Amino acid sequence: LLYLLKNRKDLLDRADKMILMPDLFNYFLTGEKKAEYSIASTTQLLDARKGEWSDEVIEALKLPKNIFPEIVPTGTKVGELTDEICTELGLDKIDVMAVAGHDTQCALVAVPASEEDFIFLSCGTWSLLGTELAEPIINDKSEYYNITNEGGYGGKISFLKNIIGLWCIQESRRQWIREGQEYGFGDLEIMAKEAPSLKCFIDPDAPEFTPAGDVPSRIREFCRRTGQPVPESIGEVVRCINESLAMKYRHAMEEIRECTGKDYKTVYMVGGGTQSALLCQFTAN
């Protein structure tokens, strides 16, 4: 929006409403221009305490207030299927619901937690680790630890930290395939189990691991630079990545505990990362 304001103000002047991608599908289905709470909370334009668009931020950026649509709670009715779609598909009127547009919050709804205080870990290419709160925590400590407050189902706050996930494993596997060594993820886990434990650690969030490419070589260079044993075999590299991720999760949990003042007995893990028995076990350890 700020780019448009500075470089293509003519487009912004013609805009009626800003509709985020998940809300666009609801608009196509119903004709209603609404903003679902969870996806709106990811824009940095939401007041986390009020659950409304932040007039303070919008005014500071000099953005037109009229383009921001009404925010609707997650899990509530947006509208009904349009007459045109009903006729085309031969359907009766159907309610269209505002499901959690933010995929992490959608996954979190499925967490089978019975206790009030728990840690969730949504693990895929990225990992998101956090807890649910009734109210946001916005202070110097949460800012220092770079922990965010995102909106969720039932008006709850997901107090969470973004961490790299299985990206390093995925990119390492692609590199080995380029080198003529193609292994399935199950094969990589078997090799990792046979490698020595707690030999070396990387910071998975270090900037050198973000670009695609030869991640195994970057891991070895990181270990040399930090005075650690260097993982040479494929199994050693995979074990290093998994143990480093588990250690990163532990570190993030300690930061969340420090901010909330709560103790957590249970971690619920969801997402594609749960298919890795090795990562699940290291995380539990």
Which role fits each region the language model picked out?
Residues 2-34, 45-55, 59-60, 83-267, ...:
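Active-site core segments that coordinate phosphate-bearing ligands/cofactors
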